[in-house]
Design a protein with these regions (language model features):
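Extended, low-polarity transmembrane helix blocks
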Residues: 1-29, 36, 45-53, 57, ...
Length: 127
């Protein structure tokens, strides 16, 4: 692999993870409000710690390139589930965009899962 490809793979992981790290951190700072929003959408607020762990922890693991394929698959599934549960009012333009943003991110995660993390990752250390 060349340096450009290696750098692009790392940059891609960082960019894909950024939204999840930021979302997980914001859920910590707005914990009660997020639980209420989840409950209003029919999702038990008790699941919030798992959501935060997946968003924040999964995002950081993706950046580090640790267990990358597994994390990418988990984030792909989470992205599709989140689209279906929280952004399903496709008649609302904002929700339409959010729905397909999540679906597009799932596609990016599936590519990462299929191709692996690249050279600049903990998964490839020592190789």
């Amino acid at each position: 692999m060349n340096k450009l490809q290696n750098s692009a793979e790392l940059t891609g992981r960082i960019l894909m993870a950024a939204i999840f790290v930021l979302a997980g951190a914001s859920k910590i700072t707005a914990y009660a409000g997020t639980q209420q929003y989840m409950a209003a959408m029919g999702v038990p607020g008790a699941l919030l710690p798992l959501v935060i762990a997946l968003e924040l922890g999964g995002g950081l693991l993706l950046v580090a390139g640790f267990q990358t394929r597994l994390i990418a698959l988990a984030l792909a599934g989470f992205s599709v589930a989140s689209a279906a549960l929280f952004h399903n009012n496709l008649g609302d333009q904002t929700q339409f965009i959010m729905f397909f943003k999540n679906v597009a991110m799932a596609g990016g995660f599936l590519i990462i899962a299929a191709h692996g993390p690249g050279a600049y990752s903990l998964d490839r250390r020592g190789n």
